[in-house]
Swiss-Prot record:
In plastids the minimal PEP RNA polymerase catalytic core is composed of four subunits: alpha, beta, beta', and beta''. When a (nuclear-encoded) sigma factor is associated with the core the holoenzyme is formed, which can initiate transcription. It holds the Pfam family RNA_pol_L. It is found in: Plastid, Chloroplast. Keywords: Chloroplast, DNA-directed RNA polymerase, Nucleotidyltransferase, Plastid, Transcription, Transferase. SMART domains: RPOLD. It comes from Gracilaria tenuistipitata var. liui (Red alga). This is DNA-directed RNA polymerase subunit alpha.
């Protein structure tokens, strides 16, 4: 097994929306550098989640090629500026933001009214200018996702009068890696892996690498317990293995994890003694935490908790 160290050799914040980090991983066996570098690059660029504005409603506007009286930018320019807005969301459900402003004024993201689950990374990010005493009203929907979300231009079918925006959720804007060989002896060659990460400020380069590694761990973890035995025994043995898994493998939020621990729920076996309704009876365990646990069980282990506890007559 290879044990390596990772060191951050350079870190800088060029602006609220630009962070950079350079890292070195060493020592690696020959061939491991490209394996790690390529896996991290693909995962970090495609799988890390971010937040973006996906739809907008502007008072008095019915299509994206309109102009707004008293506003310097037309609707299309405003949509393009909103597409660049960098956000961080602590909610998996869509959120609504708003602004109502009378001019003359400069509209920046710092003037947006957003739920507490949403963090605006750059409050000075420019959106538009109101040139006279026009009242500008706008609502926008924020969603969480990964990669790109390309949509057909036009109104959002989910909400009347909402114009859709092509959303870019990727928190990492660029990722480079290089591998350098180091000859230790005539028969031993080790490698040094250099990583360069650029982010949009919604997370740091260090966080990006950590989250990317967690995604890869979750992806490969099921392969660590392969056991091809008699098909008749497979289901029972799989169930026993699952029951022994600790709740740490669900990668829950700190709040949900602590509530389960205080309720003496330490393993999946303990958790399966509860129904969805019974989870809500745990002290300080709200609907949001229950939904998080239910989703984690389904996505990571393929287990669906019953809505209610089955009561069998004895």
């Amino acid at each position: 097994m290879t044990y390596f160290q990772i060191e951050c050799v350079e870190s800088k914040t060029e602006s609220n929306r630009q962070q950079y980090g350079r890292f070195i991983l060493e020592p690696l066996n020959k061939g491991q550098g490209i394996t790690l570098g390529n896996s991290l690059r693909r995962t970090i660029l495609s799988d890390l989640q971010g937040a973006a504005i996906v739809a907008v409603r502007i008072a008095g506007i019915n299509h994206e090629f309109s102009t707004i009286t008293g506003v310097r930018e037309d609707v299309l320019e405003i949509l393009l500026n909103l597409k660049k807005v960098v956000l961080k969301s602590h909610s998996d459900t869509p959120q609504i933001g708003r602004i109502r402003l009378q001019g003359p004024a400069i509209i920046t993201t710092g003037l947006f009214e957003v739920p507490p689950e949403i963090l605006i990374i750059d409050p000075q990010q420019y959106i538009a200018t109101i040139c006279n005493n026009t009242i500008f009203e706008m609502e926008f929907r924020i969603e969480k996702g990964s990669g790109y979300k390309l949509v057909n231009k036009g109104f959002d079918k989910k909400s009347i009068d909402f114009l859709q925006i092509d959303a870019v959720f990727m928190p990492v804007t660029k990722f480079n890696y290089t591998v350098e060989e180091k000859k230790i002896s005539p028969i031993l060659i080790q490698e040094k892996l250099f990583l360069e990460v650029w982010t949009n400020g919604s997370l740091s380069p260090q966080e990006a690498i950590s989250e990317g590694a967690q995604v890869l761990h979750s992806l490969f973890y099921p392969l660590t317990n392969l056991n091809f035995q008699n098909a008749n025994n497979t289901d029972n043995e799989y169930e026993e293995e699952i029951n022994q898994v600790l709740i740490e493998e669900l990668q829950l939020s700190v709040r949900a994890y602590n509530c389960l621990k205080r309720a003496q729920i330490n393993s999946i076996s303990d958790l399966l003694d509860y129904s969805q309704d019974e989870l809500l009876e745990i002290k300080n365990f709200g609907q949001k935490s229950a939904e998080e646990v239910i989703e984690a069980l389904q996505n990571k282990l393929g287990i669906r908790l019953p809505k209610e506890k089955n009561i069998q007559n004895t």
